Amino acid sequence: MAALNEFVSVVVSDGSRDAGLAMLLVSRPPTNALSRQVYREVIAAADELGRRDDVAAVILFGGHEIFSAGDDMPELRTLRGAEAETAARVRRDAIDAVAAIPKPTVAAITGYALGAGLTLALAADWRISGDNVKFGATEILAGLVPGGDALARLTRVAGASKAKELVFSGRFFDAEEALALGLIDEMVAPDDVYDAAAAWARRFLDGPRHALAAAKAGVDAVFELPRAERLAAEQRRYVEVFSAGQGGDAGADPHGG
């Protein structure tokens, strides 16, 4: 286990079981409020997880009580001008860093995922939630709008009409509604959240890592890049993965046959 500063840790399996499985753990009791320091530590953790050769899949976890209640509002209220702009940028950079981890990622959601906490969960590839979790795009209740590319991520999953309703109202909604909207991929008993997320991630531990990274980048690029740029990047990744496979790194026909 390599501790990162005060609130964020990277925990990697010791190899006796689930070799390649890692956890990005946010631990800032009681609510895992996301301050500028927490965001900076998330960026560092995501960068480490992306670089480490002993990591094949990542679980994003806030502990067994709560995922995150969102931004540190007392801190935000003290910011002015340039400080607020810096805070918005570091939030976006943290969310982007998690989304850019070039490995399969699963958010294990307990308790509450509110505001920026919901956005952080949406940065993972998949989300497993306890059946008692409360969700909400709650920034409007503080007179704010969601940041960190939250509006795009929420709209992508729930559609424009539903995203507007959730953001404009700031209301809480339960795991059953989140599942119906596609915001989570599986709903389990509260005590089973981490184990269910690990089971989800475990399916990819022995997969071809270069190909998985290329496939993830390709899917994400559908939403993020203009068509011409996206197709050029897709072709480049295909050639890179094919070349790696010619060296014995891939076990399947690159044409899918």
UniProtKB/Swiss-Prot annotation:
Pfam families associated with the record: ECH_1
Catalysis: reaction(s): a (3S)-3-hydroxyacyl-CoA = a (2E)-enoyl-CoA + H2O; a 4-saturated-(3S)-3-hydroxyacyl-CoA = a (3E)-enoyl-CoA + H2O
The protein's enzyme class: lyase
NCBIfam families: PRK05869.1
Annotated site location: Important for catalytic activity: E139
Protein name in UniProt: Probable enoyl-CoA hydratase echA17
Protein encoded by which gene: echA17
Organism: Mycolicibacterium paratuberculosis (strain ATCC BAA-968 / K-10) (Mycobacterium paratuberculosis)
Sequence similarity: Belongs to the enoyl-CoA hydratase/isomerase family.
GO MF term set: enoyl-CoA hydratase activity
Task of the protein: Could possibly oxidize fatty acids using specific components.
Keyword annotations: Fatty acid metabolism, Lipid metabolism, Lyase
Enzyme nomenclature, EC number: 4.2.1.17
GO biological process: fatty acid beta-oxidation
CDD domains: crotonase-like
Source species, domain of life: Bacteria
